[in-house]
UniProtKB/Swiss-Prot annotation:
This is Adenylate kinase. It is found in: Cytoplasm, Cytosol; Mitochondrion intermembrane space. Monomer. It catalyses: AMP + ATP = 2 ADP. The gene is ADK1. Pfam families: ADK, ADK_lid. The keyword Iron does not apply. Residues 92-121 are annotated as: NMP. The lineage of its organism: Eukaryota, Fungi, Dikarya, Ascomycota, Saccharomycotina. NCBIfam families: adk (TIGR01351), PRK00279.1-2 (NF001380), PRK00279.1-3 (NF001381), PRK14527.1 (NF011100). SUPFAM superfamilies: Microbial and mitochondrial ADK, insert 'zinc finger' domain, P-loop containing nucleoside triphosphate hydrolases. Its main location: cytoplasm. It comes from the Eukaryota. Its EC number is 2.7.4.3. HAMAP family: Adenylate_kinase_Adk (MF_00235), Adenylate_kinase_AK2 (MF_03168). It comes from Eremothecium gossypii (strain ATCC 10895 / CBS 109.51 / FGSC 9923 / NRRL Y-1056).
């Protein structure tokens, strides 16, 4: 019974002393119960959001980003860490293309036919492959890291159109910036585990056993194009392609640059700052 009911009773005919005593005894007993119940409800309502926030604390924030950088800038080091921290998919478009071809998907069959004829896979096919991965790959539910795409303004525009239509617009385009001279020193000493893509460096990040993968014990290889002359051509092509893309994302307001010449831990910290995490 509410206090308002008791107050309504109190306005009635005057009661005798024993009746009044019983009235007020019952009134205050019920009042204590009502107050206790209200306080308990308030405590529960205050604790519930806290408990929910604690339960959700292990769920990482979503990220949707493009990772830009020349060969040797450290994308292969940083992308797996981003994938693990934020529980997102890492879409290295070269790997994605090879996977679709190997699986003989409809898009993979189209791409293989074009490549077998010596042509370049169209922007439309590449964007549709990314769209397919975002839809079918459970790792992409919380976001994605795009690596190796886009490389041209039309690709960037088609990608943006598709992502906006999917309700998954890009949050950030992070560029790993580094001088070409340092890249030459890095890449000409690079060692790769072909099966996993793990990379090492003869000087900066040597394997525990020379020319041997730390995880599997398989032999490491040095890529045939990891030499100074081949690298210069790759860097020239990269700069010609990438500068317009960087300008495109600067204009959209989502670009952030990170100095990739720093130690990997510092680069990692700066990437998180660029993401606002």
């Amino acid at each position: 019974m509410s206090c308002w009911t008791y107050l309504g009773r109190a306005r009635g005919p005057r009661a005798s002393a024993p009746t009044a005593r019983r009235f007020f005894a019952n009134f205050f007993n019920d009042l204590i119960v009502a107050v206790s119940s209200t306080v308990g409800a308030l405590k529960t309502s205050q604790q519930t959001p806290l408990k929910m926030s604690q339960d959700m604390s292990h769920v990482p924030e979503a990220i949707r980003m493009v990772l830009i950088g020349p060969p040797g800038a450290g994308k292969g080091t940083q992308a797996p860490k981003l994938k693990e921290k934020f529980c997102v998919c890492h879409l290295a478009t070269g790997d994605m293309l090879r996977s679709q071809v190997a699986k003989q998907t409809a898009l993979g069959v189209q791409a293989k036919k074009i490549m077998d004829q010596g042509g370049l896979v169209s922007d439309e096919i590449m964007v549709n492959m990314i769209k397919d991965e975002l839809r079918s790959n459970p790792e992409c539910a919380n976001g994605f890291i795009l690596d190796g795409f886009p490389r041209t303004i039309p690709q960037a525009q088609k990608l943006d159109e598709m992502l906006v239509a999917q309700g998954k617009p890009l949050d950030r385009a992070v560029e790993l910036k580094i001088d070409d001279e340092l890249l030459v020193a890095r890449i000409t000493g690079r060692l790769v585990h072909p099966a996993s893509g793990r990379s090492y460096h003869k000087l900066f990040n040597p394997p525990k056993v020379a020319m041997t993968d730390d995880v599997t014990g398989d032999p490491l290889v040095q890529r045939s194009d990891d030499n100074a002359d081949a690298l210069k051509k790759r860097l020239d092509a990269y700069h010609a392609q990438t500068e317009p893309i960087v300008d495109f994302y600067k204009k959209t307001g989502i670009w952030a640059g990170v100095d990739a010449s720093q130690p990997p831990k510092t680069v990692w910290s700066d990437i998180l700052k660029a993401l606002g995490k």
